[in-house]
């Protein structure tokens, strides 16, 4: 079991993107920082907002890239390479069109599924896709032509409440995730209903 050393929350920078569906991953990392009572601070070296906390004697780094989504890998690779963090010790939290709001799923490895943030991370890690993902469901607009405006839009209140609930569920299994006990975390998280 590999302990998680880096948790990345994907999103786009700037106030115009705050609270958009595409920033679900960043919201997750913000909630971790708040729970751990650490401040995310800008770090130009890693092209993002970073923080660090300790869990069972291990350092865990938080990262929200301040590059745009399709350049997230630049930020992730800079931090992972500097601290020699292997892909299997990274958890990337991101919005997931293929899951309904209120559903969160853990996954290890796989493709990018059309997600430009994941696509760039895989490329910047030297085509290594063996990192863990926290997929936060945002639903799908029903037509591929509507996806861009959908992910960059704010969710209606009821939908946002479901997303917030799925983040709460994910925070509940975070100790198991950090310890590398993904089987237990997946059993608990995947049985939750928002």
Curated annotation (Swiss-Prot):
It is an enzyme of class 3 (hydrolase). It is found in: Cytoplasm. Its main location: cytoplasm. It catalyses: an N-acyl-L-alpha-aminoacyl-tRNA + H2O = an N-acyl-L-amino acid + a tRNA + H(+). One of its GO terms (cellular component) is cytoplasm. CDD domains: PTH. Its EC number is 3.1.1.29. The keyword 4Fe-4S does not apply. Disulfide bonds: none annotated. The record marks 12 as: Discriminates between blocked and unblocked aminoacyl-tRNA. InterPro entries: Pept_tRNA_hydro (IPR001328), Pept_tRNA_hydro_CS (IPR018171), Pept_tRNA_hydro_sf (IPR036416). HAMAP family: Pept_tRNA_hydro_bact. Hydrolyzes ribosome-free peptidyl-tRNAs (with 1 or more amino acids incorporated), which drop off the ribosome during protein synthesis, or as a result of ribosome stalling. Catalyzes the release of premature peptidyl moieties from peptidyl-tRNA molecules trapped in stalled 50S ribosomal subunits, and thus maintains levels of free tRNAs and 50S ribosomes. NCBIfam families: pth. Monomer. Belongs to the PTH family. This is Peptidyl-tRNA hydrolase. The gene is pth.
